[in-house]
Amino acid sequence: GYRKVEWAEDHDLFLRMMRAGMRIGKVEKTVLSWRDSPGRLTRTHPAYAEEQVWRMKAHHLSLESRVSARGVAICGAGPIGKRLARMLKQEGVQVRGFFEVNPRRVGEKIGGVPVAGQGEFGKRWRNAVLLSAVGVEGGRERVRELAGAEGYTEGVDFWCCC
């Protein structure tokens, strides 16, 4: 059931259910008519703020055995990737590196973690779990393509985080 957490309790429940092996699906017929309003909790309560959503993602990722054992490599060294890396480190996850397409970022270190170029994708940090943190339009699909071509399996050793 629900528990007291700093983030959205319903999302937390769904993530715990999925980790426990439960499946979530869509019911084909309408069972509830939903009214949305500007005063809705998901738009006004601090537990639903973007920062808390990322904390929840980092927390639940840190509980994945592959993530805790192998660490992660993050696709995207922009604001989203940096935020995710910082929060994962706070959860005790080893961030092994970033992959980035911007040539100005390649070779830098972010929080002591190296940034590699696209040419090293699938070779460097290959044992780490791959996380996509690319927020630009089409970014998720592009990383998903590259990950699949390199033998990553989504939901096993690769996740899209945004």
Predicted regions and their residues:
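Glycine-rich adenosine-cofactor-binding loop
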Residues: A69-K89
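Hydrophobic residues within well-ordered alpha-helices
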Residues: M17-M18
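Short hydrophobic segments within beta-strands
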Residues: V27, I74-C75, F99, L131-A133
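Rossmann-like AdoMet/SAM-dependent catalytic core
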Residues: M56-R66, G81, M87, R140-R144
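Short internal beta-strands
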Residues: R96-N102
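Phosphate-bearing ligand-interacting subdomains
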Residues: P103-C162
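Acidic donor-binding loop at a coil-to-helix junction in glycosyltransferase catalytic cores
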Residues: E6-L13
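Catalytic core of nucleotide-sugar-dependent glycosyltransferases
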Residues: K29-S37, R43-S68
